[in-house]
């Protein structure tokens, strides 16, 4: 029987309504260079290991755990030529976008193998090991994030690296206030909730602290409906301070 988190049904339904991230599709490689998705650069930065010489015995094995609409997958393919890439997510709608994104960018031609599959990161025991695991903005949407971290740790090859991104309490205090306010007003995580959430922002006085902070910091990031919903309407998320983060890592 496949494994899943208790929050999987509600989270997958949320991302089927709001495929995320909402970055536009384009023809050709993704823009710019993002070193955190280049395995050679990450290894050189984190452990001081030089890239393997040309003709190394095997390609990098990369897992994109929670790939969403494929923005990270696209970079992972283009920045790691010849790699073997597995990208998984629980949202069918997001994966449909991911497949179209990578097709249009030419990502499959850059790597030895690219698989994009609807699977939980908790259900990958038959895969791996992986030299590099990318999990950005995923574990904090599990009901039991510790189980997700243990599952990813078990998939790492000896000497492998895990690129993990989690929400931080300190960077989200104003977002948490807005989330709590919307929740108390009965704003849901569907299309109606999205409309009401946006209207509430516009109805707040221009001098309101939360509106002002949103307009100064997040307005551009949340222009797309999926990005607004992911930030303010998500049905399942947690965040960490340093102490809880260290305890979380130790739990794996």
Where do the language-model regions lie?
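Conserved alpha-helix/loop element of class I SAM-dependent methyltransferases that forms part
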Residues: 27-59, 75
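Class I SAM-dependent methyltransferase SAM/SAH-binding core
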Residues: 63, 73-122
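A short SAM/SAH-binding and catalytic strip from SAM-dependent methyltransferases
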Residues: 131-144
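A short glycine-rich, Lys/Arg-flanked "PGG" loop and its adjoining helix->strand segment in the class I
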Residues: 146-158
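Conserved class I S-adenosyl-L-methionine
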Residues: 59-68, 161-211
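A short acidic, Gly/Pro-enriched loop at the edge of an enzyme's catalytic core
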Residues: 122-132
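N-terminal, positively charged/glycine-rich alpha-helical extensions of SAM-dependent methyltransferases
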Residues: 1-32
């Amino acid at each position: 029987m496949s494994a899943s988190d208790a929050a999987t049904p509600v989270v997958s339904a949320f991302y089927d309504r709001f495929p995320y991230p909402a970055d536009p599709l384009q023809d050709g490689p993704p823009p710019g260079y993002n070193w955190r998705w280049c395995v050679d650069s990450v290894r050189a930065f984190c452990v001081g290991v030089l890239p393997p010489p040309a003709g190394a015995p095997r390609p990098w094995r990369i897992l994109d755990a929670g790939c969403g609409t494929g923005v990270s997958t696209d970079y992972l393919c283009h920045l790691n030529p010849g790699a073997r890439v597995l990208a998984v997510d629980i949202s069918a709608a997001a994966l449909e976008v991911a497949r179209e994104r990578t097709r249009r960018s030419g990502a499959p031609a850059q790597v030895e193998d690219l698989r994009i599959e609807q699977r939980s990161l908790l259900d990958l025991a038959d895969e791996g090991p992986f030299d590099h695991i990318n999990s950005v903005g995923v574990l904090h949407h599990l009901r039991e994030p510790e189980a997700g971290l243990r599952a990813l740790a078990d998939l790492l090859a000896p000497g492998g690296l895990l690129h993990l991104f989690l929400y931080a309490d300190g960077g989200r205090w104003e977002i948490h206030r807005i989330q709590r306010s919307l929740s108390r007003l009965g704003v849901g995580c569907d299309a109606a909730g999205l409309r009401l959430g946006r209207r509430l922002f516009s109805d707040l006085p221009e001098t309101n602290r939360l509106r002002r902070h949103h307009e100064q910091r997040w307005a551009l990031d949340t222009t797309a409906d999926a990005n607004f919903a992911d930030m303010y309407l998500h049905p399942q998320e947690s965040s960490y301070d340093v102490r809880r983060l260290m305890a979380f890592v130790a739990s794996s």
